[in-house]
Amino acid sequence: MTLRKLGWLLLGALLVAGAGEAQERKVPYWASINTGDALMRTGPERTYPATWRYRRRDLPIQVLQVYGNWRRIREQDGTEGWMLATLLSAQRTAVVTGNGPAPMYADPSSSASLNWRAEPGVVGRISNCESGWCLFDVGGKRGFVEVNRIWGVDAGEVVE
């Protein structure tokens, strides 16, 4: 077998393994929209009408159901519908909620120095979530935000 054929076989095996892993995730789970143009539909096929067009990359969503290559999702305001799995990413993101800016601290403590403030509606990537805090990154501006000020992570959830 040539090296080229072996490479194609390995690539195919990785793609199949990755697809199976995505199917096995336990719902509900968090994900994000990975494109600046995504349609939410009323059902799990392209023949169903689109109800919403999303033009905001990294918007957090919650996956409620898996049906083939389709995911039934819920967004922050409670709207539910179907979206192609290829439009979604495992990248964890969150959106600031509540009244007024959310403080972003240097450490996961309200007594730590204040790095930034993020207005409600600001979307950022999250990591290092534990004990009620998440590291929130908005275009390189980072700080720890209390979990109760963001939508995109469950209370008590640990995110690496």
Located regions from the model:
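N-terminal signal peptide c-region/cleavage motif recognized by signal peptidases
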Residues: 17-19
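Second-shell loop/turn segments in exported
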Residues: 45-48
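Classic N-terminal secretory signal peptides
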Residues: 9-14
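SH3-family beta-barrel domains
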Residues: 22-42, 53-57, 64-79, 83-108, ...
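Bacterial N-terminal signal peptides that target proteins for export
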Residues: 1-8
